[in-house]
Amino acid sequence: MTDEAEDSGPGGYAAARLRLLTEGARSGPPRRRALAELTDGWLAGLFGAATEEHTGISLVAVGGYGRGELSPRSDLDLLLLHDGRDDKAVAALADRLWYPVWDLGIDLDHSVRTPQQARKTAGQDLKVHLGLLDARHLAGDLGLTASLRTAVLADWRNQAPKRLPELRDLCAERAERQGELQFLLEPDLKEARGGLRDATALRAVAASWLADAPREGLAEARRRLLDVRDALHLATGRATDRLALQEQDQVAAELGLLDADALLRQVYEAARVISYAGDVTWREVGRVLRSRSVRPRLRAMMNGRNGGKPVAERSPLAEGVVEQDGEAVLARTARPERDPALPLRAAAAAAQAGLPLSRHAVRRLAATARPLPTPWPAEAREQLVTLLGSGRPTVQVWEALEAEGLVTRLLPDWERVRCRPQRNAVHLWTVDRHLIETAVRAAGFTRRVHRPDLLLIAALLHDIGKGWPGDHSVAGETIARDVAARIGFDGADTAVLATLVRHHLLLVETATRRDLDDPATVRAVAQAVGTEHTLELLHALTEADALATGPAAWSSWRGSLVADLVKRVSGVLAGEPQPEAESAAPTAEQERLAVEAFRTGGPVLALRAQTEPPADSAPAPSSPSSPSFPSPLSSPSSPSSADGPEPLGVELLIAVPDQAGVLPAVAGVLAMHRLTVRTAELRSVPLPDGVEGSVLLLDWRVAAQYGSLPQAARLRADLVRALDGTLDIAARLAERDAAHPRRRGVEPPPPRVTVAPAASRLATVIEVRAQDAPGLLFRLGRALEAAGVRVRSAHVSTLGANAVDAFYVTRGEGTPLPGDEAASVARGLEESLRT
């Protein structure tokens, strides 16, 4: 210890502490031990300077400090233990200990108790009891500290049947509140499931002698999380356990890792080890407690049949697999070394029965099972399909296989996606867990398709290409071909699986970003899919993939668009005649709105909550001649109350005399009223014979971001002002943004605007990918107006914080843009979004 550290004063300790944290070794156990030892010496010096009495009183470290796990900004958990002597003298001693800690700005969790008080408090407060399990003597009466440790540990073991269920419930409640560490983009290293608190809970279970946690990899997982927390404290200068996005690169650099993705992957791997150990441990705790509550033979008699005879302790599930005490285990006659399909058979049997696969069984399979031949025998492939088709129980069984490395042994390509983060707020899961979740969802659709096996394998493989650079669909197609052949599919089935993986995004992207009335759109999808059976599989895979992604990726609105596209493509594949591309004639309602707009010289608004209005009714227009339009855009019958986070919304029809600036004006007014645009179409409507002039008709589907939708009359009034220039939409939106600034985390990727070649024969398709923000469509509309192009239709899609929009644009006379002009418009749009 340095001379400065030997100085019991705050200055000496502070200097030595600073030197250790800034000039010492990187984050890791040696530095944590050194920091704990340095702090121990300082506190012992404070204790010695504050009192000459060393009997009947001691200073004790508890909790994380008791374990010697001091991170740079950790608080100090201290207990001043005394034998009940003069309270004033003890209080004075406590002040002489606590104030120097506070003077250095170190957080302190402190208490002053007798051993009896400490035990009583521990009996009433589970968290206090957990902290005392890690009690460590610092100074004073060693015997007093040792006696407390012995008593607290004895209490813990005696009370384990009561305390462990409380601890299990505490862990479950915390997991529900904080989420799972292994899937969060900004995880709490301490509180989330699989974090440091769960690791501490497993130590407490082991201390009870009632059950023990799996030890393989657990200490290493805990060390990794502690190392990350150390680096996080140094990077932020704060006592935080939340690994925020903006700190991840700096933390990765502090740990010598390549980048933030490598950091998250290490964190996820550690959390997965701790989570799985927790699952196994708590199952064992439950088993032991059940066995203590009822004698085994009595329990067997109570559950028995045949005149009360005891039932067998083992029930067969499959060849070589039995159920025992709520788990799937290997039969006594099982020989993994002679049965290469046994790992998959055991996993499938466990999942089908809704049982966890015993850890002992998995370890034995991993240690002794022979590798499968290539190609796999039919039984192995069928067992994999059975496992994937078991629904929700598949997840825990797959995690058991993963914990012992069996998944990557069966599917080597899995290693590239294992624990791989997805830096997209839309995704709830890592890549590998998303693939399993997709299979779980697909299991519910197996009655919709003619080949459930192909659907389930495609679900497992559809994002496998994310472990390689480039377009993951293209990379995934190659991997899918290799995997399909390796596991025993024939050439035809392999081709179908490759098509499903290559085009797993085709339906949803086309349905939400393309004009489905354009025959070229439908023909392109039909050409890519090839057959009706493949289309059927792709439809089910699309929905399963989206549902497994997260709530922002699927809704009744998206589902209806995809179903419409599938119906049209199915017609093409069936050889049904397709209509030629032409502008649809206006309906009677649209023509009526156009005439009203021309007559009044201003915009006319109408709404339609249903997809199709009743034949004998039409929505009343909102115009100067009908000022009493009373109802808001929402109504009890509106599909906005449909299930899913994205309601269909309402159809908003706007007719306005042809003039410049209509698109940005409408988009801006809708943004002002916090309306989300689902789809947008704009076209010129000819007036009846004998009437000169033209009217623009905008057919948009909108929904409120939150709250109720505004009155149509309010929308019309603001639109009139926007069109005549008396309403400065840009200023209003800027004013609102300034009044409610959004917290910024990491800098989002820059916007990207591209031209989609050959996407339509009717128009040029310009795709925009950008960070979603209020008024984005308004800004795009202004830029398109400035470019002098006409917008035929817009297809708007928002996924989490990402906007993916497609605009069908033409020249003024209605023809597609030449290539160079289209590229120039795209560049202009991109520049407008960057400024």
From Swiss-Prot:
Q: Name one Pfam family in it.
A: GlnD_UR_UTase
Where are stretches of biased composition, namely Pro residues? 621-630
Region (Uridylyl-removing), start-end ranges? 317-650
Region described as Uridylyltransferase: spans on this chain: 1-316
Q: Where is this region: Disordered?
A: 610-645
As cofactor, the record names: Mg(2+)
Q: What is its EC number?
A: 2.7.7.59, 3.1.4.-
How the protein is activated or inhibited is described as: Uridylyltransferase (UTase) activity is inhibited by glutamine, while glutamine activates uridylyl-removing (UR) activity.
Main role? Modifies, by uridylylation and deuridylylation, the PII regulatory proteins (GlnB and homologs), in response to the nitrogen status of the cell that GlnD senses through the glutamine level. Under low glutamine levels, catalyzes the conversion of the PII proteins and UTP to PII-UMP and PPi, while under higher glutamine levels, GlnD hydrolyzes PII-UMP to PII and UMP (deuridylylation). Thus, controls uridylylation state and activity of the PII proteins, and plays an important role in the regulation of nitrogen assimilation and metabolism.
> What is the name of this protein?
Bifunctional uridylyltransferase/uridylyl-removing enzyme
Originating organism: Streptomyces coelicolor (strain ATCC BAA-471 / A3(2) / M145)
